[in-house]
Structure formats: structure tokens, C-alpha cells
Amino acid sequence: MSKYAISVLICLLAVNAKAEQRNFVFFLVDDLGFGDLGYNGSEFYETPHIDALAASGMRFDNGYAACQVCSPSRASIMTGKAPPRHGITDWIGAKTGMDWQRDDLVLPAEYVWNLPHEDITVAEALRDGGYTTFYAGKWHIGTKGSWPEDHGFMINKGGWDKGSPMGGYFAPWDNPRLESGPDGELLTLRLANETASFIESSQDEPFLAYLSFYTVHGPIQTTEALRNKYVEKAEKMGLTGNDTRFKFDRRLPVRQVQDNPIYAGMMESLDTAVGIVMAKLKETGLDKNTVVIFTSDNGGVTTGDAYSTSLLPFRGGKGRQWEGGIREPYIIHVPGLTKPGTSSDVLAIGMDFYPTILELAGLPLRPEQHVDGVSLVPVLSGKNIPERALYWHYPHYGNQGGEPSSIIRSKEWKLIYYHEDGRVELYNLINDMGEVNNVAAAYPEKVSEMQKRLNHWLADTGARFPARDPRYSQERFDQKIENTRTAKMEALEKQHAEFLDPEWEPAGNARWWGSAED
């Protein structure tokens, strides 16, 4: 064979290999809870496109975020490392040490404010493997100099310091990496359209399209039309007569019912956005060779902030140490590998995406980088992986009532250790998924064994811990809790009942209310 023929053959093989490389679309939603989706039991929110995605691939029913708040989870997806190992253990901007002045027993630990440049992100690994890498939406894991384009993404549409949309969800907005659209344009749909445009222009090269929605993080905003739609739906479902929407749990009220029509409108827009991207994949024929991943960075907001949703039967939500704060929608669809409509009980966590993506891309794993993640490819193909425990460390107080704690989950058992006073909670999640019955006193040997494993992990990851606040006053703390239990509960009940009043309108100059974008 001539040198020319050999060269042509090599080129053809290279082109064919590139054509066979899988593409990746990664949907990361902000503050989306496990129970916020139709396929997980929500009857009030409407999410047909996300439900269809779940039905097309594998659902991980024990899928978890790496933390109960956003920045640590996001950094763990990017690095394959647990939060105490990469150092971002709280949302970037949260106060620490003596700057924390909320009459709590301990001072939150210090944490890292920028994604470490010495870490090789999953985007950098794919870029170095020949992929075009695209980012759209919320970043919130670094200040300028540590934005998506500084960590492996070749295109950045909207990722910067901030964790919520400056100016709100409807244009005009303020974002140095995303030009504001015409007045009334919805940011959620804009990000989806930017992603779809990227896919359209990238049909000849393998790509990673990472769509990180700002939604459904506050501010809670939707159109008048969508809000009215869900007011009518609430009436038909008999939800408007609720006198009690909240129950007090330790530090804050917790929403007990899904009936917020504004949040429901946001959920519908999120689903529409997912549908835009999925439709583009089908239109271009890339759906046959594109891995689609869908997850959230932490639980839904059941307490604090906008008190948006309910995640029952799980306890708590965003910021809190119970299942509502960390168990997430976790979907992986791999054409030709995953069987439609399948689910897995395997324990999975955010760090697992990194090695899973590399293996599916046919690229070498980087075990020294994604040290806390394992590839889920065997599970996706119907096989098993060795059993393991999952761990969390959050040495901070959450705005949503979370307490400084560390967690281990091993099989059906979950142990929570509280750094304020050393108390523990032990739950059997098979028998008690709502974490109602603390059985620590009944199983002292199990507590001891799990606590030893947790302590070993904390030492191995270099975890930082909170310190006692010398200013602490039990009297002031008790008064704070009592005020929240009474005045806050009453105000919330009144406000959230008003949301369902057909005559309700937002106060002030709320330009989002008049938008026609849906």
C-alpha cells in the first residue's frame, strides 16, 4: 500500500473515530429538590420533558449532591473531589469566624473562595481529549480569574461570580458574560437557546455542553399567565383552602405542601428549557450519540429564602442535613447503553460524574484527580460496583436552618454528627426515609463504628471545623428561635395564602410580572 493510501486511511479512521465519540449535555439545576419533578411524584408541578428524559435513561434513586448548598456541590462535580478536599465548603460569599453574628453556638469554619487552579476539571480533561467545551449559566465557584473560561470551558455564556441572576430572570439583567436580551426575555430560555445554538454549530466535533441553570434559585419569578394557570390548578386540586402550610422544625418553618403558583411557573419554564435542548439534539440527529445528564446542586428550598416548595416525605431541604437537603434528581441517559425506564438503588454522588464522563468518552481516567468519585458505567450497563459509604461535611450554618454537621451514609444507615455539641442522629433510611426516629440510643455499636469511619474520612480530606463563639448567649438564641416560631410562622402563612388569591399582584415595580415570555 502506498504512503498516500495509508495517509488517506489514517485520516478516514480518525474522522470515523471522532464521529463515534460521544457528546455530552449536562443539565445542572439550581435548588431543585428530589420531589419537585413529576416522575418523582409531584402532582402540582408540570415537568413532561424532564420526565421523558428520566424515562429514557437510568434514574439513581439514591443519587446525592456533594453538599446541601450550591458552591461546594458545583466544585465537586467539576473536580471529582469532596468539598473538604477542594476546600469550598460553603456557598461563596457566606460569612465565617467572628464575622458570623447570628447568636449561634459556634463560628463557621473558613473556606476557599475560588476553584483551585491546580485541579484539572472535567472540562479541562475533555478539552485536552479533543472536545469543544461550552458553559451556560450559573458558575458561583470563583471570582474573576476563576470563571468557566479559566477552568477548561472554551465558551462561557453567563457564568461569573454571582449565585443568582442580577436584575432578575427577565431582561434587562446584569451579567458581564451574557448580553441582556430584549426587555422581557426570560433568562432560563435564553440559556437554553444559547445551548441549542452551540449544539447546532458543533455537529462535526465532539462536545460538552454544560447548561447550569440559575433557576429555580430565588428570586421566585414567573409570568402573570403562568402564575394564573397554577392558581386555577391549585383550586381544582383543592389546595387553596389550606390553613396550615408550614411546620416548625428545630430552627425554621418548613413548607409542607406544593402549591406555590409562582414557583410552579418557574418549574414549567425550566422544563420548557430542557425541552428546547432535547429537541435540538433530535433535530440534528445527535440524540443518537449524546449522553445526557440531569441533576441538581442541592435540595429544594423548603425553609428560608422564598420557602418555595415541599419535599415530603423527605425531611428538610436546601441547606439542611437531612435527605431533603442532599438527595437529588440524578439521571443519566446513554444511547445504546442505558435501558429506558430503568432505575438503580446504588449510592451515587456528584463526584461520580467526572470519572463516568471520562469512561464514556473513551478517555483515560484520572484517579489522582477524581479521588472521591467512581465511574458508574458498570451500573449503567446493568452491572454492580463495590458497595461504599458516602460522606458529607458542612462546618457552617445554612440560611435555611442547616447546622454544622458531618454525615456518613452506609447501606441503609445514615449518621449525622453535630459539631456544636457532639450529639448524633442515626436513621435507618429504608424504614424511616423521613428521618423521624433517631435510633442512636438503640444501636450504640453501629454509632461507634460509623463515627470511626466518618472521623477517618474527615482526617483524610483535611476537613476544617467550627470553633466556639465566645459571644454566645443561650438566652439570646432561645429568644431568636421563639421569635421565628411565632412571628415568622404567622407572616409566612399569610404571605403564601395570598399567592393563591386570584387578585394578587407583586408589590413595587415588578417588570417580570408583565412579561409575555413563557
What label would you give each PLM region?
Residues V29-Y45, D61, A65, A82, ...:
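Active-site-proximal cap/lid insertion segments
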Residues P84-V122, D174-N175:
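His/Cys-centered metal/cofactor-coordination and adjacent catalytic loops
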Residues I10-A17:
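Hydrophobic h-region of N-terminal signal peptides that target proteins for export
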Residues E20-V25, S56-D61, G129-F134, M154, ...:
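Loop/turn elements at helix/coil->beta-strand transitions in domains of secreted/extracellular proteins
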Residues A123, S197-F198, P404-R409, W413-Y417, ...:
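Short, surface-exposed beta-strand/loop micro-motifs that present aromatic residues
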Residues S2-V8:
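Sec-dependent signal peptide recognition
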Residues P48, I77, K138, D287-T290, ...:
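Polar, surface-exposed loop/tail segments
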